[in-house]
């Protein structure tokens, strides 16, 4: 796995520099505080997770969809394409790439409609406004942005190998696995190789379970400073998440979120490259 990763587009093109990521985000931070942007990340990851669970997708498919979502908004403002449209588009594409099988058009739209109505009605009082033609057009922009670099490496496999090597599978794996799932609510998947994220999650799990693994970690030939950077992000996530009341806060945050500009003529909704939808904006 490791050898393949270092030659992959994931490593060569999609491990980003933190300063570049923050620079790209400045357009959105004119409208949102950093904390509100973090909360948006948590929220839309929850939306993708709920969509995936509704469609009975494997966790790896959901994780890949989340990475696609984050990659798009690492390069473009939130106002370029409505995240409410991008979320199911990423799920649709990830289900094909991860060879889960194509989710049918009808099931996808029904799932998005149901999930927003039943799980997130406090944030989205209206019906899911998009149809399959919007999803397919959005998929085109997503593929273009990622330059068809669709294979994503995740921390799950290295985590399993590390826990087996440590000999503490039953004790540590369930908790460490959940922590890996939670890291997708941060930028970590854009900034660090998956094996480092796996080690950081395992380290946190060891601390929580009071497992002394100092000797095991000391024998690794890995940059522990980077592992500690990742751990700090994980702890910050839990601190913010603990104080985040989605039901009370999300409607206000979504109202502040920059949105695609409505077309000058609502009859002929003209988006980028002549697309006929007001959910797209090039600015």
From Swiss-Prot:
One Gene Ontology biological process: G0 to G1 transition
Subcellular location per the Swiss-Prot or TrEMBL entry: Nucleus
Segments for region (Disordered): 252-283
Tissue and organ distribution: Highest levels in pancreas. High levels in heart, liver, skeletal muscle and kidney. Low levels in brain.
Keywords, sorted A to Z: Activator, Cyclin, Nucleus, Phosphoprotein, Repressor, Transcription, Transcription regulation
Keyword Phosphoprotein: yes
Composition-biased stretches (Polar residues): 272-283
One GO MF term attached to the UniProt entry: identical protein binding
Primary role: Component of the Mediator complex, a coactivator involved in regulated gene transcription of nearly all RNA polymerase II-dependent genes. Mediator functions as a bridge to convey information from gene-specific regulatory proteins to the basal RNA polymerase II transcription machinery. Mediator is recruited to promoters by direct interactions with regulatory proteins and serves as a scaffold for the assembly of a functional preinitiation complex with RNA polymerase II and the general transcription factors.
Similarity field: Belongs to the cyclin family. Cyclin C subfamily.
Protein name: Cyclin-C
Gene for this chain: CCNC
